[in-house]
Structure formats: structure tokens, C-alpha cells
């Protein structure tokens, strides 16, 4: 049955606006028919919902508009209008078909119909376009390619092109699939709805489009792990089709070789039915859409026959089967009806270089494959010779697809190693036929064919980027050409849609215009010819646009997106071919076949008459009414027959009066059936009547519309004919004008020829006249001759006319040639314009590439800057971490140092105690032995003023019965950084060593600072001392300093290795080099002696000693200048009672400790470098502190001076004449003198204390504590002094000498003031008695600060060359301020304390004169101490220069040092003195005076 042609399409191929479409709900009787319904009837359904439950839905669906378009040329309009009118009739059989397929509910109030059994309305489906963005590849990530896409939402994106940085490039799609979309998600979003439409009967086209290397093949085919669209589609199709309904045969192949086929679907159905060996299919004739009218006639007759039956059950089942064909998705599987048989056919081919090749061709590879040709008719494409294989399982289908993919053309380019070089087309056909109809009754119209076409398009590419040449370049050019043609076709469809919209607007505004759209170039490419069926015919089209997110592909991607934007705006028409159901014949025939034919014959005749009548466009209402009457009669007869066949129950007699309940129930059921049949018949009659009235009104309106359209068309034809007439007239006028011009020219030529002819005739006449005159006139010409001549002239004229015609013809040809050349010129100009556009595009691309290069350079620079900054920040962080780690390590090291220092202090204390015990024992033995030896001597004191006592020599008074005494300094042990001061027991042993010692009962008191105060009372003596001689001696030991670990030199933990001499000194065995004294020249002030001193100290420090020790035990040598036999005997006897084994064990432990500390030394040396920088800062702070302390000391000093002056004033003045200094000096050292050994270590201590960052002003003095030398002053109340003869024996001891003194002597061991550098001033004694008071006053003044000026008795060598160099530099600065200072000789201690007592008979005591020579000193290394010392030196030098005797005294002392070498030397270093360089030794010369009976105070 042919569909009706509706009015939305005008003869000029214009579409009517929506408000002019005819719908049953727009008629005047709408309210009358549908006032009880909830929703109006929609004439055209815009969706796929086919379950509309409205009473007139089935009726509306029968009236269906055809979408066939009119021709594009005006000369086809009339003919097509004629054909449309022929088809504008409604067949009465269609009504009966609809009535036959309608079902009613049992309640009689609700009507339902199945629209699938009827022709479905056409659906205008917009083309779905999906965008899939592939992720960046590894190479793109390594090359740092950026993503040019920005996903705005699920349906729109924006792209940033390399040419333009603007974000205006925004595109919208049906759906946007981001890079993280999986294959199942893509299939569910895109392909699943398409498969559902395919199973319901729609034709579906799916395109995969994009540039090369964008992921098209992966999307379509996928991989083994992630299959693509094709494998998943096959799985879904075979899962959805019931197994019992699937055609199962061996693989059956079809070859399309029918050249005369006009419909692919009909041919396929014929081939299927012909080639099938199953009983389900039968052979049928060829079916074509043009033959549908004939087939519909046959079907209508069958419908009328079936309509007469009363078997409503069969019709209900058929309708239910039809309704079940609608596929419903239940999860992944689509449920379809099992009332049909299904068969699936697959074909796979490719389009390579404008040729089609079958991918399923099994021909040998050696043979060249033959290309296939396309044949098309009525917009249906057929490929001749293409294989189509019947498949019955998923495995078979997959094998076929894999075979085709293996035969596909694949090549490698720069951008893609496996680039597809052809368009692959996979076609899946699904044939559907009803199962309940026997094979003999199957009609081809009952077979439905739906197609699923999946096309994997080859990627568009640029040869400049892919770098293809040769055959690959040709492949790329053919791919680009076919894609360009597809783009033009889609753009043409878009323009047609826009024009149709404009025409609709013009119709609504009642404006008329003629638009001639350009034809769409479908035939320019095989790809577009294949796709034409789906775009322009019946089908749904979808497109998957695959794009690359790389910024380098942004230009090609932008073109693809523009193409997809055009494709999104087009729409396709999709309709489902209805399934015609033929129910089985009725079981109870009510009307004979002849009567049904006679009933049907008027209707068919009416249809034929309407088809032959070209001017009738409306229904024949009378025929419809007749058909209604026929239906009423039929229904009435059926009801009568049904009633007559009802069984009547007469079982009462047979059952003996019992009720036959079964028969009664049957009667009730029959009554209900009759009631329902009446209702049904009434309802059908009403429905038909309403349908007839509806059709009548609809046809009236339709006729009006057709009349209007016909009038409009006639007007247009008139206008067009007028235009054509005008054009013909204009052409004719042009031809006439040309002919007139040509005839005018010819007339001009003829006139000229006639003139020439006349002239010639005149000449001939003249010549004849002359001849007549001369010659007798001949015979005249006859008429025939004249006629002949005229005819000749006419022939010439005709020849000329022919020439003119030929010239005109040539002119026409020339015009045509010129017109053709103009067209060629226009073409060439277009080509040149295109080339110019391409050149401009290339230039813009070059500029964009240059800009990209600059941007890349800038990006690289920025990256380098960022990298540098990050590296700098990392380096800074590493430095900070290293500093933190370093600080942490140093803190740990400091903690270790503190712990080690504590251990060292314990060891030092043990060594100190051992040394003290050794010294006590040794000193007691040596002193006692010396005393016993001195008792033997008979020579005593011999006071002789001109002779001076040399250092460490004994003086013997001339008259003395007591044993002699030698004046030796009291020994002090130095352990580590501490000086061990004598204990009480030691002092008592020293003072009371002799049995006759007068000092046994000495008073010993402890001072506050830790020292001792000893007061010796000299008993009365028969010897009368000179007036002014002191009768008491008082001195004080240095206080014990407090431990300060920062005073250690060399980071506080270094100690020298103990050598053999040190070991002997510790054990008390002495040294082998004790008697080897070095001669020095005191008068030489050059630096050579100092260099010798430094070299000796260096040689000492350069010994192979491991300098990791808690402190070096210094052996202190204070040996008096006594004979060798006495000294050796004393030293040998001192080691007899000492346990050497215990000491050796302790020394072994010390050796092990040294080895452990050696490893730590290197680490601490590194730490020392860092601490040196901090020391410099600490020095500045110490300078300010020292200045403050100096001021305080000066104030304290002034206060003490005032107190001393008061004391001196309170004492009586002593007037004693003394001899001049010249008389005191003698060449032979016969007189006994007292000298003191001063050892100044303040400079070294100050230097090391500054380096150790400690404020060691007080500690320096504590470390430099020494026993103040004994000084003798003359008592003011003593009588006139008498000269004492000096000792003549060199073996007398100073201890015994003091024991022989009768007067009371008080000795104070006092702590020196801090930071005071002692300086010794030379004092001279007066020779006259009148100047005794002045001399004594000067002596007291010079001796006021003697404890501060005298250096420590014990000193050590410098252990470092660096300290010696710093002291030498500092000494050069102080040399300018004092003239008496000079480089120190190579000595460590020098003390000369001699006291000569001249005891006269009858006198108390003889006076003692003290002469102190100037000191020899060095500048200390610390600048602050140097300033202090320089002040003291300058004061001392000024005092020295005041007397003339000081120079003589200095010479005398130097001579004594050179001759006698009476000085003490220590070969070992002291840890305390390591902090400073070796300081000069001070010498003090004492001139004896007559002792007096009164006590003498020494401070």
C-alpha cells in the first residue's frame, strides 16, 4: 500500500510551516470526537514512542505523508504534481486492515491499538555527533605537549588554536567524552541506542571521523583487552535475538550480481528466500516499492476475507505479536519478540584510492583483487560482486570481522606507524519475518530488512606533517579528496535545511520567491554514494569525532570540529517498514468467497477510477458509506449465525429432575457472549461512522489545500512561462537585429555590384556604339542570353549570400568559443584565488610556527629560570640543613668535651697529688742532707759591701756559730693548668728541717684565696743588727685558682706526650740534662738569641709526641748552684721510697688515654677554625671589660699606696750611710745577695684566654700565682748598720741561712693582683748616714708593689710556634716605649735571693741593703696587656734612669749571668703557659745590709 502524499511539500520543494500541517485535532469536529480523551492525537510523532493509547491513534497513523521530494528543475514540477495526485487516495482495504488489527478491552470503555502493525509515521531525527578526546601519548608527554581542549560541560568544549589564542572557538555536541572514558562507557552512551533502533527495524549509520592518529580505529575495533564498537555490537545483537528464532545454517554467501535490481532490500529478501534450504523461507518474486500498489491490493483482499471471520482470538494474538516487536532494553541485553524469525548477514569492504575492494575475498594473495562497482537506483546503493555471509553465532561473526581487518590496507607515517590507508565499511543486515504464518502464506511485504553500517574513515592528514612520498602520498590525497566531498555533501544538506526554513517563513508571511539550491555532489565519491541512502533516504546517522588533544594538531582538529558542527545541524528521516500479518482463515465461514469478492469489487473499482482520475483529490464518500453498510450487514449476519450455533442444554430429563448446573453456566456464558458481541458490533459501527466523518472533513480540508497549492503552482507556471517567453523574444529580437545588419551589409554590396554592373554595361554600350559606327551592327542578344546572364548574376549573388551565412556561422562559433574561454578564464581565476588563499594560509601557518618557536624559546627560558631558582632554593635549604647539622654536631662535641674535661680533671688531680707527695719527700731529704753538709762548713757570713751576692750562692757571715743557710726558692708543682701551692706540712718541713732551726714554731695561716701566710719569728741574736734592718719576713703563697675549662689552649683537650725527662721528673729521678746549662749573652739585644729560644721551643714541640693529653705534667727544676755531688746525692736519695710500679701502671693508662684522644684531635682542630672567628668578636668585648678592670685596679692601687704611706710615716726613719753602688759591685761574687726568680706568664695566659673566648682577667692572675720573693727592708728603729761579710762557701743553703737569723721574720705567701704585669725597678742605696731616711723611703717605695711586679717562680716553655710569633710582633711595639726591655734570654726561671748578715759582737744585727736590678722582659702578645706592661715598664725605666747606679747594677747582673749561669731552667712545658708566649725572666739583685734586731716586713 502506497503512502499518501501530504501537503507539507510544495511543488517548488518547499516545506509548509508547522501551523499549516493538517492534523485531526485541527479540524472543527475535534471537540466532538475527543472531548472525553486526556491528550490530543498527534499526527506526526517526534519520538519513538509507539504506545499511544488514544482512540484515533491507529486511524491517524494510517494517514501518513510521503517524504519524496519534487525535482529541482521547473520542467519536472507539473509531472510530479500529477503523480502526487494519483497517490492521494485512501484505500478502503487499509481501513479494514486497521479494523482487523484493532483490539478492544473487555470493559468496553478503553481502546488500544498497535501501531507497529500499521505504517509508522516518519521520524525526523537530528544527526547525533559525539566528541571523544584521546589522552596524550607518552611521546607527547615527554615532548611537553599541552592540552588544547577545555571541557566546559558534558556537551560543549573550547579549543585553543595555535593561530589564535582567543577562547572563542567553542563547539557543542550531543555528548563530550573526556580522555578517561572507557570503551564500555562509550558503547553504552553511543552504540547501545543505535543497536536498539537497528533491532526494531531502523537503518543506522555510524561514522568514525577525525585526523590521523586520533584513535578512530581503536574506537571502532579496539584491542583484545578493550574491544571496540564492532565486537561489542555483535555480542549485543546475538544476545538480544532468541536462539530459537535465529537462522541457523551453514555459512551461506551471497554475491550481488543482479544488474537489474532496483531495490537492495527486495533483492536481498528474494535471495534469502531462494537460497535458503530451510522450510521457513520460500521463493518469492522480486519486490519493489513501485509494485506496492499491486501487492497492497492482494493484501487488502486477504484482509477483507479475514475481516469477515469471528475468530477474534487469532487477530488478538497477531496484534500482540506485532506489538512485541518493539525492542526494550533490559540492562545490556535488548529484549525483542520471539514471534519472528531472524537472520544476520555481514559484508565487509574498503574504499581504497577511489576503488572498492571486498575484504572477505578469499582469492589467493598472488592474484590481484578486482575492484567492485557501485550500482544504484532510487537512492539505493548496490555493490556488484560483494560477498555477504550468513552468520549464526558471535564467534563466526568475529572471525569474519578479523579476516576483513587483516586484509585492510595499513601504512606507516611520521605521525602514526599503523595508519589506516582506506575507509572500511562493515554492513550488518537483519531480516525479520513472522513465525506463525506458514511458508506458503508468507508474502515478501512481510519480510523486513534493517541495516547497521559502521564506517571507519581514514584520517585526514597533511603531507607536510606526515612527510609522505610516492604511493603513500597518493593514498593521503585520495583520502583527503573523499573526506572533502563528504564535507561538501553535509554542508549541502545543511544549506538545504536552512533554505527550507526560510521558505517556511516566506509561506507564513505570504511571500513568494524562487530559490534554486545547488545540487549535492553525492556522485563525486564512492563514500558519499554509500552514505546517501542514510542521509536522504531512510535511516539514522550518528558520528563519533575523534580528536587529539595535542596543541601541535590544533589546526587540523579545529577543521574537524567545524565539519562536525555542520553535521550536527542536519536531520535524517527514519521510518520502519510495517509488518503485515495475515491471520489464519476463519473456522466458521459466514459469507461465501464470491460475496466477499463482490463486496470488494466496487471498492477496488473505485480505487482504480480514483487512480485514473488526475483531477480528483478527495475521497468518494458514497463508496465509503456503502462499505460501512456492507460491514453492518456482515456483523449482523455473524451475530445471527453465532446465536444459531449456541447449544441448548436439555439434560433435566436425563438427570431425574436434577439441575444441570453445567448447562446453566454455559447458558449464562453464552448470554454474556451475546451481550459482548452486540456491544462490540455497536462500537465498531460507531467507530467506522466517526472515521468516515473524520475522513470526509479531512479530505475537504485537504482538497482546499491542494486547490490552493494548484493555484499557486499555476501562477508560478504562468510567471515562468512569461519569463521563458520574454527570454525567447529577446533572443529572437537579437537574431532579427543580426539578420537586419547582415542584410543591410549584403544590400550595400549588392548595390555596389549593381553600380559596377551598370558601369560595365555603360562601357559595353559605348564600346558597342563605337563598334556600330565602325563595324556594321551585329545581331542583337536574344532574351535567352539575357536570361542566362541574369541567372549567372543571381548565382553569384547566391554565392555571396552563402558566404555571408558562412561568415555569420563562424561568428556564432567564435562567440561560443569566446564564451567558453570566458568560462575557462573564470575557472582559472577561481583557481588562482584558491591558490592565493592557500598561499595566505601557508604564510599564516609559517607565522604561527614562528610565533610558536618564539613561545617555545620563552617557555624554555622561563623553565630554565624556574630551574635555577629551584636549584638555588635547594642549595640554600641544603646549606641551612648543613648548618643545623653542624651546630648539632658541635653541640654534641662540646658535650663530649665537657665530659672528657671532667675525666681529665680527675686524672690531673691524681697526678698533682702524686707530684706533691714526691716533692715533699724529695725536698725534705734534699734540704736535710744539704743542712747536714753545711754544718761541716766553718766559713760563715762575711759582710763585704763592695761585693754582691750572685744568684743561688751561699753567704757566710764572718762571725756566726749557727749553720749556714742557702736561699733557694720554694718549689711549686705545676699540674695541667693549675699551680700547686705548698701545703702546711711542706712549709713546716722546709722551715723545720734542721734540728736547730729557729723557725720550727712558725705560724702558718690559710688565706681567703687558698694560699698560706707564714710568720717566722727570728729569736734574739748576740749579733747586733744595723739600725733599719728588718727583723721579720712576711710573704704569701698564691691562691689556688678555680678550674676554668675555657683556659685550655688548643681547644682545651690537647696535651703533650710525656718523654723520658718528664717521666724522670714525675718519678723524682731527675734528668740527665739537669747540669747542662746554656750560656747566654745578656748584653746582646738582637733577635738571634730570641730566635734561638724559639728554635729550642720549636725543637721541643717538634718532638714526636702525641699532643692529645689532658695536660702535660711539668717538671719544675729549681736547683741551687751547689756542687754536683750534693745535688746528685739529693736527687738519687729522693726516689728510694717511691713505689715505681704503681706509677708505671698509671703511665700505661695515660698512654692508652693519649691514643684515644689522638683520634679526636683532628676533629677538634676543624672546630677550632670556626671558633677563631668567634674569638675575634669576643676580643672586642674583652677589651672593654679590661679597660673597666684597669680603672678599678688603679683605684685599688692608689688606695693601697695611701695606706702604705701612712704605715711608713708611722715608723721611725732609719738613717744609715751606705756605700755607693760602685763600691758594692765587685768582680768576685763574695758578698751574699738575695735574688728572686720572677717568671711572668701573664702575656701568654692573656693570649690564650682571648682565643678561648673567656674573660680571663681574673683567671690570668690566678694562673700566674707565684710565691712573692723575699724582700728585706731596713727597720726604721734599728741602729746604724754594720757590714756583713758575704758567704764564702758556695754550698750554704738559703733555708739554713734564714734559720740562722735571730730576728723575727714573717713570710707572707700572697696572691698577686689580677692583670698586673710586675715590673722591677732598680733601687740604689745611699752611702751617707744623713741620706738613710731618704734611701729607706725610696726602698720602701720601690718595694711597695714587689709582689705584683715579681713574676711567677715557675714557668713553662711555649708549646706553639704561633704564640711565639705573636709575642715577637707585640714585642716590637713595646720596644719603642721602654729602653730597658730586651729579648729574654733562653731561661725559664731566674732567681737570686741573697741576704748577707754581718753579725758584730755586741750589736743586735747588721743592716741589709736590697738592690733590685732592672728586669729583662718581652712585650706580651695581647695588646691590652701590652699597654699595661708598657706603662709599668715606662715607669720602671723612668725610675731606673733617675739613679746613675742602675746601669752599673744591670751590667753587674748580666756579667754574673754570663759567668756563673745562676739561673733556673725548666725543659718542660706548662699547660698554663701554653696560652702565652715565653715571657722574659725577671732578675732581682739584693744587696746585703746590716741586720737589725727589729723585725722586717716583706710584702
Curated annotation (Swiss-Prot):
Chain intervals with Polar residues compositional bias: 1029-1038, 1266-1294, 1395-1406
Protein location: Cytoplasm, Cytoskeleton; Nucleus; Cytoplasm, Cytoskeleton, Spindle; Cytoplasm, Cytoskeleton, Microtubule organizing center, Centrosome
Ranges where the Kinesin motor domain occurs: 126-570
Basic residues: compositionally biased ranges: 72-82
Bias type Low complexity, positions: 252-266, 497-506, 1217-1265, 1324-1334, 1365-1383, 1425-1446
Coiled-coil stretches: 739-923, 1134-1257
Keyword tRNA-binding: no
Tagged with keyword Endoplasmic reticulum: no
InterPro entries: Kinesin-like_fam (IPR027640), Kinesin_motor_CS (IPR019821), Kinesin_motor_dom (IPR001752), Kinesin_motor_dom_sf (IPR036961), P-loop_NTPase (IPR027417)
GO biological process: one example: protein localization to cleavage furrow
Keyword list, A-Z: ATP-binding, Cell cycle, Cell division, Coiled coil, Cytoplasm, Cytoskeleton, Microtubule, Mitosis, Motor protein, Nucleotide-binding, Nucleus, Protein transport, Transport
Entry's Gene Ontology cellular component terms: centrosome; cytoplasm; kinesin complex; microtubule; nucleus; spindle
Biased composition (Basic and acidic residues): 1161-1212, 1338-1348
Cross-referenced SUPFAM superfamilies: P-loop containing nucleoside triphosphate hydrolases
Family assignment from sequence similarity: Belongs to the TRAFAC class myosin-kinesin ATPase superfamily. Kinesin family.
Functional note: Microtubule-associated force-producing protein that plays a role in organelle transport. Its motor activity is directed toward the microtubule's plus end. Required for cytokinesis. May be involved in a vesicle-mediated transport of myosin II, the Aurora kinase (aurK) and other proteins along mitotic extracellular microtubules toward the center of the cell and the cleavage furrow in order to ensure cell division coupled to mitosis.
Name this protein carries in UniProt: Kinesin-related protein 12
Amino acid at each position: 500500500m502506497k503512502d499518501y502524499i501530504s501537503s507539507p511539500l510544495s511543488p517548488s520543494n518547499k516545506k509548509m510551516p508547522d501551523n499549516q500541517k493538517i492534523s485531526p485535532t485541527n479540524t472543527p469536529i475535534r471537540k466532538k470526537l475527543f472531548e472525553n480523551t486526556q491528550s490530543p492525537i498527534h499526527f506526526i510523532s517526534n519520538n519513538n514512542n509507539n504506545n499511544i493509547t488514544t482512540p484515533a491513534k491507529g486511524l491517524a497513523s494510517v494517514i501518513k505523508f510521503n517524504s519524496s521530494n519534487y525535482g529541482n528543475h521547473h520542467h519536472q514540477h507539473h509531472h510530479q504534481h500529477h503523480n502526487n495526485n494519483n497517490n492521494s487516495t485512501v484505500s478502503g482495504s487499509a481501513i479494514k486492515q486497521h479494523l482487523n488489527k484493532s483490539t478492544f478491552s473487555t470493559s468496553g470503555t478503553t481502546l488500544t491499538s498497535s501501531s507497529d502493525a500499521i505504517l509508522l509515521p516518519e521520524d525526523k531525527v537530528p544527526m547525533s555527533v559525539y566528541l571523544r578526546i584521546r589522552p596524550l601519548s607518552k611521546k607527547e608527554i615527554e615532548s611537553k605537549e599541552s592540552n588544547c581542549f577545555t571541557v566546559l560541560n558534558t556537551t560543549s568544549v573550547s579549543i585553543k588554536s595555535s593561530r589564535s589564542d582567543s577562547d572563542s572557538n567553542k563547539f557543542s555536541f550531543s555528548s563530550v567524552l573526556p580522555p578517561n572514558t572507557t570503551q564500555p562507557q562509550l558503547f553504552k552512551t553511543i552504540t547501545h541506542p543505535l543497536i536498539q533502533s537497528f533491532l526494531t527495524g531502523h537503518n543506522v549509520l555510524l561514522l568514525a571521523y577525525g585526523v590521523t592518529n586520533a584513535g578512530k580505529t581503536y574506537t571502532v575495533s579496539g584491542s583484545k583487552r578493550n574491544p571496540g564498537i564492532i565486537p561489542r555490537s555483535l555480542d549485543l545483537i546475538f544476545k538480544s535475538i532468541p536462539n530459537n528464532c535465529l537462522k541457523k545454517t551453514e555459512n551461506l554467501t551471497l554475491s550481488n550480481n543482479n544488474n537489474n535490481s532496483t531495490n537492495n532490500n527486495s533483492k536481498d529478501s528474494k535471495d534469502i528466500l531462494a537460497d535458503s534450504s530451510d522450510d521457513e523461507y520460500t521463493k518469492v518474486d522480486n519486490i519493489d516499492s513501485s509494485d506496492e500498489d499491486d501487492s497492497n491490493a492482494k493484501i487488502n483482499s486477504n484482509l477483507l476475507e479475514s475481516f469477515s471471520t469471528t475468530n477474534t482470538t487469532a487477530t488478538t494474538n497477531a496484534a500482540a505479536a506485532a506489538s512485541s516487536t518493539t525492542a526494550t532494553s533490559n540492562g545490556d541485553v535488548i529484549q525483542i519478540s520471539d514471534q519472528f524469525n531472524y537472520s544476520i548477514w555481514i559484508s565487509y569492504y574498503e574504499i581504497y584510492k577511489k576503488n572498492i575492494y571486498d575484504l572477505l575475498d578469499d582469492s589467493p594473495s598472488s592474484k590481484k583483487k578486482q575492484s567492485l562497482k557501485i550500482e544504484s537506483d532510487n537512492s539505493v546503493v548496490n555493490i556488484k560482486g560483494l560477498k555477504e555471509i550468513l552468520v549464526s553465532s558471535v564467534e563466526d561473526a568475529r572471525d569474519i570481522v578479523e579476516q576483513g581487518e587483516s586484509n585492510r590496507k595499513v601504512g606507516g607515517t611520521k605521525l602514526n606507524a599503523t595508519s589506516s590507508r582506506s575507509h572500511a565499511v562493515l554492513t550488518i543486515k537483519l531480516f525479520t519475518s513472522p513465525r506463525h504464518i506458514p511458508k506458503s502464506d508468507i508474502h515478501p511485504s512481510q519480510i523486513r530488512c534493517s541495516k547497521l553500517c559502521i564506517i571507519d574513515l581514514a584520517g585526514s592528514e597533511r603531507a607536510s606533517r606526515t612527510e609522505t612520498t610516492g604511493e603513500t602520498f597518493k593514498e593521503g590525497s585520495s583520502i583527503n579528496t573523499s573526506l572533502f566531498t563528504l564535507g561538501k555533501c553535509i554542508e549541502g544538506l545543511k544549506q538545504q535545511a536552512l533554505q527550507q526554513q526560510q521558505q517556511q517563513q516566506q509561506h507564513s508571511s505570504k511571500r513568494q520567491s524562487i530559490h534554486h539550491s545547488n545540487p549535492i555532489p553525492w556522485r563525486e565519491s564512492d563514500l558519499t554514494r554509500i552514505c546517501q541512502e542514510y542521509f536522504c533516504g531512510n535511516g539514522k546517522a550518528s558520528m563519533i569525532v575523534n580528536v587529539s588533544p595535542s596543541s601541535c594538531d590544533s589546526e587540523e582538529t579545529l577543521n574537524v570540529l567545524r565539519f562536525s558542527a555542520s553535521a550536527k545541524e542536519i536531520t535524517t528521516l527514519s521510518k520502519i517498514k510495517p509488518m503485515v500479518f495475515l491471520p489464519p482463515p476463519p473456522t466458521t465461514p459466514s459469507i461465501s468467497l464470491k460475496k466477499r469478492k463482490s463486496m470488494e469489487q466496487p471498492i477496488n473499482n473505485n480505487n482504480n477510477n480514483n487512480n485514473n482520475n488526475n483531477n480528483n483529490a478527495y475521497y468518494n464518500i458514497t463508496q465509503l458509506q456503502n462499505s460501512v453498510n456492507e460491514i453492518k450487514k456482515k456483523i449482523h449476519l455473524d451475530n445471527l449465525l453465532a446465536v444459531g450455533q449456541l447449544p441448548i442444554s436439555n439434560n433435566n430429563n436425563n438427570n431425574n429432575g436434577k439441575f444441570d448446573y453445567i448447562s446453566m453456566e454455559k447458558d449464562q456464558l453464552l448470554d454474556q457472549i451475546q451481550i459482548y458481541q452486540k456491544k462490540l458490533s455497536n462500537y465498531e459501527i460507531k467507530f467506522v461512522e466517526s472515521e468516515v466523518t473524520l475522513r470526509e472533513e479531512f479530505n475537504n480540508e485537504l482538497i482546499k489545500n491542494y486547490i490552493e497549492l494548484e493555484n499557486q503552482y499555476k501562477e508560478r507556471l504562468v510567471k515562468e512561462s512569461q519569463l521563458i517567453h520574454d527570454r525567447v523574444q529577446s533572443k529572437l529580437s537579437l537574431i532579427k537585429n543580426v539578420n537586419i545588419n547582415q542584410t543591410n551589409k549584403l544590400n550595400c554590396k549588392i548595390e555596389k555590384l549593381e553600380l559596377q554592373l551598370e558601369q560595365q554595361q555603360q562601357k559595353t554600350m559605348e564600346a558597342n556604339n563605337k563598334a556600330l559606327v565602325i563595324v556594321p551592327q551585329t545581331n542583337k542578344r536574344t532574351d535567352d542570353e539575357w536570361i542566362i546572364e541574369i541567372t549567372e548574376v543571381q548565382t553569384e549573388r547566391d554565392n555571396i549570400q552563402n558566404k555571408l551565412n558562412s561568415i555569420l556561422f563562424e561568428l556564432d562559433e567564435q562567440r561560443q568559443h569566446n564564451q567558453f574561454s570566458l568560462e575557462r578564464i573564470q575557472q582559472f581565476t577561481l583557481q588562482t584565488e584558491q591558490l592565493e588563499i592557500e598561499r595566505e594560509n601557508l604564510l599564516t601557518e609559517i607565522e604561527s610556527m614562528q610565533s610558536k618557536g618564539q613561545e617555545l624559546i620563552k617557555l624554555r627560558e622561563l623553565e630554565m629560570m624556574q630551574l635555577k631558582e629551584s636549584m638555588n632554593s635547594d642549595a640554600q635549604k641544603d646549606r641551612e640543613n648543613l648548618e643545623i647539622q653542624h651546630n648539632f654536631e658541635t653541640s654534641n662535641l662540646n658535650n663530649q668535651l665537657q665530659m672528657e674535661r671532667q675525666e681529665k680533671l680527675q686524672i690531673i688531680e691524681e697526678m698533682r697529688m702524686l707530684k706533691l707527695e714526691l716533692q715533699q719527700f724529695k725536698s725534705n731529704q734534699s734540704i736535710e742532707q744539704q743542712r747536714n753538709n753545711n754544718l761541716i762548713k766553718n766559713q760563715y757570713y762575711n759582710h763585704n759591701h763592695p761585693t754582691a751576692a750572685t744568684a743561688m750562692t751561699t753567704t757566710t757571715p764572718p762571725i756566726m756559730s749557727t749553720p749556714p743557710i742557702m736561699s733557694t726558692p720554694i718549689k711549686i708543682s705545676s699540674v695541667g693548668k693549675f699551680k700547686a701551692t705548698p701545703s702546711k706540712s711542706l712549709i713546716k718541713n722546709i722551715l723545720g728541717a734542721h734540728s736547730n732551726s729557729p723557725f720550727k714554731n712558725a705560724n702558718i695561716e690559710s688565706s681567703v684565696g687558698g694560699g698560706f701566710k707564714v710568720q717566722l719569728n727570728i729569736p734574739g741574736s748576740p749579733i747586733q743588727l744595723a739600725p733599719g734592718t728588718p727583723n721579720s719576713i712576711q710573704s704569701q703563697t698564691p691562691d689556688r685558682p678555680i678550674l676554668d675549662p675555657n683556659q685550655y689552649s688548643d681547644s682545651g683537650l690537647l696535651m703533650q706526650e710525656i718523654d723520658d725527662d718528664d717521666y724522670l721528673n714525675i718519678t723524682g729521678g731527675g734528668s740527665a740534662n739537669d747540669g747542662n746549662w746554656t750560656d747566654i749573652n745578656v748584653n746582646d739585644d738582637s733577635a738571634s738569641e730570641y730566635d734561638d729560644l724559639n728554635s729550642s721551643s720549636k725543637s721541643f714541640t717538634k718532638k714526636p709526641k702525641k699532643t692529645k693529653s689532658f695536660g702535660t705534667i711539668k717538671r719544675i727544676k729549681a736547683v741551687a748552684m751547689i756542687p754536683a755531688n750534693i745535688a746528685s746525692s739529693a736527687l738519687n736519695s729522693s726516689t728510694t721510697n717511691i713505689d715505681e710500679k704503681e706509677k708505671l701502671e698509671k703511665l700505661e693508662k695515660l698512654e692508652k688515654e693519649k691514643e684515644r684522644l689522638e683520634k679526636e684531635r683532628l676533629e677538634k682542630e676543624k672546630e677550632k677554625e670556626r671558633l677563631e672567628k668567634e674569638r675575634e668578636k669576643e676580643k672586642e668585648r674583652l677589651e672593654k671589660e679590661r679597660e673597666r678592670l684597669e680603672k678599678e685596679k688603679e683605684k685599688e692601687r692608689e688606695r693601697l699606696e695611701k695606706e702604705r704611706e701612712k704605715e711608713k710615716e708611722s715608723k721611725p726613719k732609719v738613717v744609715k750611710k751606705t756605700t755607693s753602688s760602685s763600691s758594692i759591685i765587685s768582680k768576685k761574687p763574695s758578698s751574699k745577695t738575695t735574688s728572686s726568680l720572677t717568671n711572668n706568664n701573664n702575656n701568654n695566659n692573656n693570649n690564650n684566654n682571648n682565643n678561648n673566648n673567656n674573660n680571663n682577667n681574673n683567671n690570668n692572675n690566678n694562673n700566674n700565682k707565684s710565691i712573692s720573693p723575699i724582700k728585706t727592708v731596713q727597720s726604721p728603729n734599728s741602729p746604724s748598720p754594720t757590714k756583713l761579710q758575704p758567704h764564702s762557701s758556695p754550698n750554704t743553703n738559703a733555708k739554713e741561712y734564714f734559720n740562722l737569723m735571730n730576728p723575727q721574720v714573717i713570710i707572707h705567701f700572697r696572691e698577686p693582683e689580677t692583670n698586673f704585669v710586675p715590673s722591677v725597678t732598680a733601687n740604689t742605696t745611699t752611702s751617707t748616714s744623713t741620706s738613710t731616711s731618704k734611701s729607706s723611703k725610696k726602698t720602701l717605695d720601690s718595694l711597695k708593689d714587689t709582689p705584683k711586679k715579681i713574676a711567677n717562680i715557675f714557668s713553662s716553655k711555649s708549646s706553639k710556634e704561633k704564640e711565639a710569633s705573636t709575642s715577637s710582633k707585640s714585642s716590637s711595639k713595646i720596644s719603642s716605649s721602654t729602653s730597658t726591655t730586651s729579648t729574654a734570654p733562653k731561661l725559664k726561671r731566674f732567681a737570686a735571693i741573697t741576704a748577707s748578715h754581718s753579725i758584730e759582737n755586741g750589736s743586735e744585727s747588721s743592716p741589709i741593703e736590697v738592690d733590685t736590678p732592672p728586669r729583662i722582659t718581652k712585650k706580651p702578645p695581647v695588646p691590652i696587656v701590652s699597654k699595661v706592661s708598657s706603662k709599668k715598664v715606662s715607669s720602671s725605666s723612668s725610675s731606673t734612669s733617675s739613679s746613675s747606679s742602675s746601669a752599673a747594677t744591670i751590667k753587674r747582673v748580666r756579667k754574673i749571668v754570663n759567668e756563673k749561669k745562676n739561673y733556673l731552667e725548666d725543659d718542660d712545658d706548662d699547660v698554663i703557659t701554653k696560652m702565652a708566649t715565653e715571657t722574659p725572666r725577671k732578675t732581682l739583685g739584693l744587696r746585703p745590709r746590716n741586720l737589725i734586731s727589729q723585725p722586717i716586713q716583706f710584702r
